[in-house]
């Protein structure tokens, strides 16, 4: 999958080095080994993981700002897309937000093993993090397999600074999900979403939803943990 990685990075003007490759492969080693005892990913085949994890993460590169910026990966789980992006973009200051203790423990060990000095771990829910110092502090917030758009935007947009963006990695139901969220996004300070279709070998209906942050989020959002799931905004 070396050619695929080079192609995806090249689309953002990035030349992958031997060190990039070594760290990306080492990350996959750690992820797949830990997955034997912790439920981190449904992808267990190495080649599929090279596409579905590393390749998937690298599709976000063209949407990241040039130069140093702050990025939060909400519900980071096994570390995708946050860790691959941190490896390839060492000028990005990446925060992995994960509330599940076992997953957070894996992320902490992986950050240390890969010596990723530009990565920090927040063991917290996005709703709680967004009511603290992290509120509206990130240029980019990413989310992959975290929840439907009507929930995702309440959890994530309060973390994005005005002028920044939310990048949500979605699948076949994206149009339906956006229809459910179209009145919610402006309430949270979001602008008009853009849908970017991405082609990855062996995958279908892969899209990146880009939502700009155009105004501050009202202080009442996000609501306390679990409330969004029980009573989604409309």
Each PLM stretch: what is its role?
Residues 127, 148, 171-175, 199:
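Short "lid" loop at the C-terminus of a central beta-strand within the Rossmann-like core
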Residues 163-173:
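Conserved beta-strand signature within the Rossmann-like core of class I S-adenosyl-L-methionine
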Residues 89, 160-162:
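Helix-to-beta-strand junctions that scaffold the AdoMet/dcAdoMet cofactor pocket
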Residues 179-234:
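SAM/dcSAM-binding transferase cores
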Residues 31, 85, 170, 211:
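Residue-level signal for inorganic ion chemistry
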Residues 55-147, 153:
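Conserved SAM/SAH cofactor-binding pocket of Class I
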Residues 103-105, 174, 178:
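Short alpha-helix immediately C-terminal to the canonical SAM-binding loop
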Residues 1-72, 102-122, 226:
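Class I SAM-dependent transferase core
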